[in-house]
Amino acid sequence: MCHRSFTRIATALLAGLICMSAGLSQAADPWVEYQGTEGPGKGKHIVLISGDEEYRSEEALPMLGQILAIRHGFKCTVLFSIDPKDGTIDPKNQTNIPGIEKLAGADLMILALRFRELPDADMKHFDQYVNSGKPIIGLRTATHSFNYSRNKQSPFAKYSFNNGDWKGGFGRQVLGDTWINHHGHHGRESTRGVINPKNAKHPILTGVDDIWGPTDVYGVKNLLPSANVLVHGQVLAGMKPSDKPVEGKKNQPMMPLFWTREYTGTSGKTSRIVCTTMGASVDFESEGLRRAVVNASYWCTGLDKQISPTSSVDFIREYKPTFFGFGKFKRGVKPSDHAL
């Protein structure tokens, strides 16, 4: 064999080994990444953090990440609550979300947590992001993302949803309100999003004309005055979009459902904040809700003028979300199973 042929074969083998190594490394990552294609979001990085026991954020956030990356150009990294024993996604694990340090390079954080209590080393990265002036989108249970019941002496215990000193913790102080109650009858009364006519021309509502989801309306009774309500939540009498609104006090007045505000952290820099109390995996079957969250991602990252009413928010691959409920998550799923 000539030297030139041997070199070509050796180079090919080496390249193959490098690709295999990279593939194995990626498969072992406890998160999933979607590289942005061409689009307005190209060059910007969104970190989406899932971790709730009931509303299947571990299904919704990979779907959103795929849309934001493939349809709109953002690089998206999705983090999960992970069982450290086998590397599978375990929404019941409240203390382990690998990859939080990736927030250091993020341009936007999308959050769908519930009652987490992360180690201080991880919360340090979260805290730095919250105070950096960078934007945040909170979905559904993000208003009660944290519950410090084990380590109440942690410097980050103030993030707890029921904190008394930093009243209402992260939910109230950053997003605008903390968890109060189910305003609609959970599992029996669904939600119709009613656009606030005062804000009908807000960029986030571009192309949004219908929002409905099977989750109930949350009680939002102490929303900070600085919040700007874009959509109110109308309680429907049943679990179908055709059901009529409930009569009486539940809809008089309607609760805030989707709002924006600003938060100034310890850095002195101000963040754009978006929060909605919708956001279960089944809620995102609503094209209107998907569009509102995609538009919010543009708005949060300073791409307001790039928002289009005709941009695609179609699913990248078949989306059959699991209906909400405790203990209903799919066992044995690893982050790599969400890779494209």
Where do the PLM segments sit?
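A glycine-rich, often tryptophan-bearing local segment used as a flexible ligand/cofactor-contacting loop or short
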Residues: 111, 115-207
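Helical hinge/lid and interdomain linker segments adjacent to catalytic or ligand-binding clefts
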Residues: 29-35, 47-49, 53-146
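Catalytic beta-strand/loop cores that center a nucleophilic Ser/Cys/Thr
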Residues: 31, 69, 75, 94, ...
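Sec/Tat signal peptide C-region and signal peptidase I cleavage site
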Residues: 23-27
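Bacterial N-terminal signal peptides that target proteins for export
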Residues: 1-13
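Nucleotide donor/acceptor-binding cores
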Residues: 44
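Extracellular ligand-binding/catalytic regions of CAZymes and related secreted enzymes
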Residues: 28-41, 59-60, 67-71, 237-340
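Bacterial N-terminal signal peptides
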Residues: 10-22
